[in-house]
Amino acid sequence: MRKLIVAVLIVVALAVAADFAAAAYAEHTLATQLRQELTLPSDPSVRINGFPFLTQALAGHYTAIDVRATGATVDPLHDLDLEATLHDVDAPLAEVTSGDMHSVRAGRVDGRIRIKDTDLGRAIGIEDLRIQQPSDQEIKQLLPAGTPSGESPHGDRAPVRMVATTDLMGQRTEIIGVGLIALTGGVVRITVADVRLGRDGVGAVGLPRAVRQTLLNALSTTVKPGELPFAVTPTRVWVETGSVVVEGTAANVSLSGVSRSSARCVALQCPLTLTSQSSTRQFV
């Protein structure tokens, strides 16, 4: 009896190992093909969810596939994270193993771009920029009524807190700006409504009017971070600690020839629309 149990365990272990090996091969093949289709500088990370893999492969249907590429460039941003979750993917086994994606199609794709605060700060000339979610008190006192909170369902507007250290009247000083991020037609507009010194409380007015206005203009900016993966139209924006996330959803997406125009921009560093109301980053 013991020998039978051991034999069964060995068979199960070998089956699991074979399943993981097959999944790893398929993920590698898919990553290589997606690198070509999206014209990425390196293979993205690909994870095929669900177990066992071989059952999904034989059926030619996958519940969900996660794709992530890091360090993408759309000038002047140089450290974008591109992410996508592909749901209900139909992919014949022969195409998965051969790398041919002609018939591969996803029922739904959730695509997103993650803009890191360090990357955005370099682009607008604020090297130590930190992006955070504002407190409930800041949202209530400083932003218009009806502004969504950080816990609200993601929409086309989100509150943002921007912290930076700058030269102010000859001294290195921490400043805090609170405002709104709005997503319109794929363009991310950051409008700072209030700015204060880091040592001041919420709503404090401790800055001269001219300096305050200059800081408001310096922190407000407009960014168009390219198209989302798989030609997904961006419809939602929100703030996480350290980044701004732009997301959208598309239905019935073919993975053959996906988003070639935006992919070329990632590879060739096409110009990105980024403007600020003020180019001044040092204040006297």
Predicted features, each with a name:
Residues 37-43, 126, 227-231:
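Short secondary-structure junctions
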Residues 41-121, 125-168:
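N-terminal beta-strand/beta-hairpin edge segment
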Residues 191-284:
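Extracytoplasmic/luminal low-complexity segments enriched in Pro/Gly and acidic/polar residues
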